[in-house]
């Protein structure tokens, strides 16, 4: 039995654009459906969506047969949470609210076994090692792990060069909503000054030889960030897609019914 390859990590290293979708409905059936839609990656969100370890496990199992790569975001960058997510088989993590190089280094250390890091050894109980059926898992696991850190504050942007330079960080993801709030522009992630900060940040990350990512549901803004050099871009959320489609469908039928009930001219 072989260690699963992380083709998403390879794509980022090769600079191939990867388009993703937020999976926030916290349901394995929905996430499996999304995995058939053609996205390169899906973000299983534990920070703002009602997920836990078991629901995340179910979603990892649900998408395992498909090409869409699961990226898991814990509620915070915490070594115990990281250990649990890695043990259930997550190979790519998006770690939120990273403000300093020290925090980024701690995040990387949490994904590595000693002596390179502090990840606890429990491979006999872990789906990730296929319950010790993957030969030499302990020595090879890190080769297929992708560590993405999320920079989403003024402090993080000030420390961006140092964060991106941390060994073991594969990419930096910018969070426009929290960044805009930190800049005093709450609720304005598309503000020109926020976009300029992110464009400059993308260049900083690229100079460090790392991949840059961002959430950009607006096609024009997404195109702007891609032109700036972003590699992995989340272009929407499942909640947004469902909410808009449901509202549009209801509105279209109400409009049809209203037109049908309107008085008609005639004799």
Swiss-Prot record:
EC number: 4.1.2.-
Family to which this protein belongs: Belongs to the HpcH/HpaI aldolase family.
Source taxonomy: Bacteria, Pseudomonadati, Pseudomonadota, Betaproteobacteria, Burkholderiales
Name of the protein in its database record: Hydroxypyruvate/pyruvate aldolase Bphyt_5830
Pfam families, per database record: HpcH_HpaI
Keywords of the record: Lyase, Metal-binding, Pyruvate
Amino-acid positions noted as binding a divalent metal cation in the UniProt annotation, renumbered to this chain: 152, 178
Superkingdom, taxonomy of origin: Bacteria
């Amino acid at each position: 039995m072989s260690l699963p390859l992380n083709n998403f990590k390879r794509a980022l290293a090769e600079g191939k654009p990867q388009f993703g979708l937020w999976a926030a409905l916290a349901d394995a059936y929905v996430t499996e459906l999304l995995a058939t839609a053609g996205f390169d990656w899906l973000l299983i969100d534990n920070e703002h969506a009602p997920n836990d370890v078991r629901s995340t496990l179910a979603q990892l199992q649900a998408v395992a047969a498909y090409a869409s790569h699961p990226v898991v975001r814990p509620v915070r960058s915490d070594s115990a949470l990281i250990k649990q997510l890695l043990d259930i088989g997550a190979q790519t993590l998006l770690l939120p609210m990273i403000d300093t190089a020290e925090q980024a280094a701690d995040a990387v250390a949490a994904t590595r076994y000693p002596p390179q890091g502090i990840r606890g050894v429990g491979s006999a109980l872990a789906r990730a090692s296929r319950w010790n059926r993957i030969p030499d898992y302990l020595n090879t696991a890190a080769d297929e792990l992708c560590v993405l850190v999320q920079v989403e504050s003024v402090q993080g942007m000030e420390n961006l060069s140092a964060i991106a330079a941390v060994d073991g960080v594969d990419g930096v993801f910018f969070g426009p909503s929290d960044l805009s709030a930190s800049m005093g522009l709450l609720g304005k992630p598309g503000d020109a000054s926020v976009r300029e900060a992110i464009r400059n940040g993308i260049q900083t990350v690229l100079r460090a030889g790392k991949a840059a990512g961002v959430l950009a549901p607006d096609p024009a803004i997404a195109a702007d960030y891609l032109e700036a050099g972003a590699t992995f871009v989340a272009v929407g959320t499942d909640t947004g897609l469902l909410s808009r489609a449901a509202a549009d469908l209801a509105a279209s039928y109400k409009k049809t019914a209203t037109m049908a009930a309107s008085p008609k001219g005639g004799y």
